Amino acid sequence: MISIKLNFKYWLTLLFVCKFCLAQEKLIPVLIVDGQNNHDWVSTTDSIEATLRSTGRFTVEIDTAPQTKSIKGIRGPKADAPNYLKESYKNFRRIQQGAEKEDKESQEEEWKNWNPFTGRHQAVVLNYNGREWAQETKESAVEFVRQGGGLVLVHAANNAFRNWDAYNEMIGLGWRPANFGDCIKWEVLKNKPYVACVDCSSGHGSRHPFQVNVRQLDHPIMKDIPTTWMHGKDELYHNMRGPANNLTILSSAYSNPK
């Protein structure tokens, strides 16, 4: 009798552990890439991470691009300062310039070796707009997407890498100058996208709240999202341009209804 109880407890524990393991395996591993941006990428990453974790559906890691190390200088002596102060300042500048050179060389090596696309994640959230990546890193990013990885751009990430053809293909449309690829907009009356102005550059107006309209109701990404919903006060990009190949527009909004 005791043996039966022990076995029952054993199997109950085993089932619980297995169920826990399966639950853990179902979590989607996501990577946030940041480190440079024309917006406050630190706060944005914190917000993205908190949002993803709050769903209970994701594991989240963050990979920050190599950072520039700043070496603070000191103000040089005035013209009428004693010679010993001038000599001391010259010596300091020689030391500082040497340190800056070493730091630059070290940083270049860091950039060369930095590659967040390790294949351990199912999706990468790109909160980055800055320096061009090393060729190997760019190739890894392309291969990641080619193998089915998800690439999600946050705001100014579509400003990045204008001259990287593969990136333009992956994102479809981005913040680009006039005559760069096609400018795609949504024709409300015909309920389909169309090629718009040739000579218009990407941009945005003043920050304002705007209504988002879902255009692909049956798309899995839009599941359980209202047909129309209000977005808070924010910048809304317009005249996005690019190759626009294999592009599906899921939603749209007016940058300016007029």
Which role does the model predict for each range below?
Residues 1-11:
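Bacterial N-terminal signal peptides that target proteins for export
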Residues 4-6, 19, 30:
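Intrinsic disorder/low-complexity segments, especially N-terminal tails and targeting/processing regions
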Residues 14-23:
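Hydrophobic h-region of N-terminal signal peptides that target proteins for export
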Residues 24-27, 31-161:
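Helical hinge/lid and interdomain linker segments adjacent to catalytic or ligand-binding clefts
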Residues 36, 66-68, 157, 173, ...:
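Short, solvent-exposed coil/turn elements at secondary-structure transition points
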Residues 53, 59, 108-109, 190-258:
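Catalytic beta-strand/loop cores that center a nucleophilic Ser/Cys/Thr
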Residues 117, 126, 130-220:
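A glycine-rich, often tryptophan-bearing local segment used as a flexible ligand/cofactor-contacting loop or short
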